Amino acid sequence: MAPKGSQRVVNKVVAENRKARFNYEIIDTYEAGLVLMGTEVKSLREGKANIAESYASDEGGEIWLINSYLPEYLQANRFNHEPRRRRKLLLSGREIHRLRSAVNREGMTLIPLKIYFNDRGRAKMELALAKGKKLHDKRESEKERDWNRQKSRLLKDNG
């Protein structure tokens, strides 16, 4: 139990996949729990994680996080975890069914957006149902972003 004077940080983001919003068109987001070992949680609490190259996949009616990197916890000894192991995601049956049908039918992908700790101290992941952008879509969104920046600069200078 935490000491009386300590304040717990709510929704502390541990890892974020920044390129996801550039490379994919986000259709819908879901909050999923993570099945982790003790050393993985300690490594996450230190703020060490990388989900930039990871994705989620459906296997046997369950959703698994693949290719995420949680480095070994340095104070752990032989009971340490494997850094790139597959991790099970906890979602409701209805959500799993909805995600499976969207991925199979419409050719969408499941990508993690961020890992954070909720107000109860549980590790959670924001999972996105997304569709990959083509090169011209990426260029278009970049032009739009640049134009919005220019507009705000002009309004700031003139206003």
UniProtKB/Swiss-Prot annotation:
Primary location group: cytoplasm
Function as written in the Swiss-Prot or TrEMBL entry: Required for rescue of stalled ribosomes mediated by trans-translation. Binds to transfer-messenger RNA (tmRNA), required for stable association of tmRNA with ribosomes. tmRNA and SmpB together mimic tRNA shape, replacing the anticodon stem-loop with SmpB. tmRNA is encoded by the ssrA gene; the 2 termini fold to resemble tRNA(Ala) and it encodes a 'tag peptide', a short internal open reading frame. During trans-translation Ala-aminoacylated tmRNA acts like a tRNA, entering the A-site of stalled ribosomes, displacing the stalled mRNA.
Name of protein: SsrA-binding protein
HAMAP family per UniProt: SmpB
Localization of this protein: Cytoplasm
Underlying gene: smpB
Residues covered by region (Disordered): 131-159
Signal peptide segment: none
